[in-house]
Amino acid sequence: MLRDLINNHKPLKNNFERLSTLFQCAINAYKYPLNGNHLSQLGELSGYYCVKDIHQRMLQHPVGQRILIDKPRVTPETFKVEELLKLNQNTFGQHSSLIQSYQYGKFMRDRDFSSSERPIVKYIPDLELAYVYQRYKEIHDFIHVLLMYDVSVYDEIVVKWYEMAQLGLPSATLSAFVGSFKLNCQEKQKLLETLPEILKRANRSEFIMNVYFEEHINTDLTQLRKSLRLL
């Protein structure tokens, strides 16, 4: 399941190379904001120490440990939307190669999304940490489903605030703050009203990287959200 990560893995040799690549990715992300690869690589290069902290939190949790051992992946092969949509409504996950649920499948189908669109981690030097960051990117859509937020600019920014508070990743922090300035006046006011609750949920809920989504077979979405203290 890590073949793509291994084949794509290109750790940078020294701090100078890391800084120069970081600078180039930042320029490209600014010049070509619709190209997700540049922003993704910027997140990798700026989030190394934060990813190490996330890895430690996973090691200190029994479920997180199992995720690190099993290294499950979110791919079109493991998350077949057409199969997910056959499950009972209001469920979230199913075991084996189906995983997830009607809610997640509907979310992906209605928006014409594919889990294969997530760029593969490239620059994080340690392969174990590269997996951790890849896992974060691959469960991002699950967070949308759990928080009940869509994929408009406003909704994406709200999710980024949650991720910033939960994970502390620089890329999430940058997206949360910079993205907020791009909202119109009405959306900014709505965000100000929403933020206290989102930050509260981020602080009280289970650490999202320690959730083994693939093991929630036919779990009712509301029950799952309750168990994760998201309600």
From Swiss-Prot:
EC number, as in UniProt:
4.1.1.130
Q: Name one GO biological process term.
A: ubiquinone biosynthetic process
Q: Does the keyword Repressor apply?
A: no
The superkingdom of the source organism is Eukaryota
Primary location class: mitochondrion
Record GO cellular component, one term: extrinsic component of mitochondrial inner membrane
Topology term for the membrane? Peripheral membrane protein
Query: Residues that bind Zn(2+), according to the entry?
Result: H140, D141, H144, E156
Pfam families this protein is in? Coq4 (PF05019)
Pathway where it operates = Cofactor biosynthesis; ubiquinone biosynthesis
Q: Which reaction does it catalyse?
A: a 4-hydroxy-3-methoxy-5-(all-trans-polyprenyl)benzoate + H(+) = a 2-methoxy-6-(all-trans-polyprenyl)phenol + CO2
| Cofactors (names) | Zn(2+)
Concerning InterPro entries, the annotation shows: Coq4 (IPR007715), Coq4_euk (IPR027540)
> Which UniProt keywords are given for this protein, alphabetically ordered?
Lyase, Membrane, Metal-binding, Mitochondrion, Mitochondrion inner membrane, Ubiquinone biosynthesis, Zinc
- Where is this gene product found? Mitochondrion inner membrane
EC category: lyase
Where does the secretion signal sit in this chain? none
Function of the molecule: Lyase that catalyzes the C1-decarboxylation of 4-hydroxy-3-methoxy-5-(all-trans-polyprenyl)benzoic acid into 2-methoxy-6-(all-trans-polyprenyl)phenol during ubiquinone biosynthesis.
Q: Which family does it belong to?
A: Belongs to the COQ4 family.
State any further remark.
Answer: This protein may be expected to contain an N-terminal transit peptide but none has been predicted.
Do you know which HAMAP family this protein is assigned to?
Coq4
Oligomeric form and interacting partners: Component of a multi-subunit COQ enzyme complex.
- Report the protein name in the record: Ubiquinone biosynthesis protein COQ4 homolog 1, mitochondrial
